[in-house]
Amino acid sequence: WIFYSLFLGLISCQSQEQTFTVHYTGLGAYEGDTVYLWRYGADRMTGDRDYGKAPLDFAIIRNGEVLFSGKEDTLHIYGMEHPGSMNFFYPERGKLTLINVVPPAIPVPDKSTNLHSQNVRLWKLWHEDDFPLEATRQFVFDNARNAIGWMVFDRWAAIYPDELETLYQKTPSQMRDSTSVLIGLKRMLDATRSLKPGDHFIDFKQVEYAEKDSLLFSDIAGQGHSVCLLFFLKPNEKDAVRTEIKNLREQYPDIRVIVPTYRYPDPESKEFIHELETDYQATILDDSRRFEKSARWEYRIYGFFNYEYLFDAQGQLVKMKPVL
């Protein structure tokens, strides 16, 4: 009998470890409404509803709260939908308590019985630290096999060109065919190549920013002077770009600086683009085109960060690095 009780306890413990429970509170304003539980891909772009499937579960809000439980699902992100709101969480093992804070009507992962809760970890990255660069990157690498890692990759992380292949190889095969961001990333990895020091530049054609003639990169790179291809994709880090170009001009007085960027609509960014053209003699390219037609695609820039490739006078890569 003692052995049997221990055996049952072991089964119960294992079962509990492999299930998630989410306790969603603070919903008093929606008392009596129905909350539906939906399953989404890691990037939250598509879910079961898009394929005509029913929700996983539903519950009525009683005393300002609902409770959902199920088997841990590391390959998906779940969403709880009630009138006018869809709130997401990662269905990891353990009991997660979410508190709906109004305003602005967002669920706060208050606590979890999982001491290694990635829901709580993500919340701290997001709302306490505003996604610090290295901690966010580490979150993605730690969760490369999980849906929550690719959700962060798709929206907030700076993963650099020479890291993408390795990161992709860590993903479960089940996610690769059903997650939009992974499908797009695989398409890029198959169509492009990763550069390393000593490699020749990759040619591309792009329109100059002021709607001038198209520019062929091979007309500049490998023509007897150093060339910096500097992707300006994070406008709140302008000072880092200024400093980098100044340093490059001190080291390579005849360097050509080519800056692919977006056509930002705000006056501050427009002013900075003008500054790059006039004060820093940079050639600005409009890289707002569809991703697969962009210079970003050719150079494996997947995300929003500033990054440079430095080529020597013969067009060989000297170094590649983020501009921080």
Functional labels for PLM-detected ranges:
Residues 239-278, 290-296:
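Structural microenvironment flanking redox-active thiols in thiol-disulfide oxidoreductases
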Residues 183-219:
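N-terminal "domain-start" segment that seeds a small globular fold
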Residues 1-11:
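Sec-dependent bacterial lipoprotein signal peptides
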Residues 216-246, 256-260:
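Short active-site neighborhood of thiol/selenol oxidoreductases, capturing the structured segment around
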Residues 13, 39-40, 123-197:
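N-terminal targeting signals for export/organelle localization
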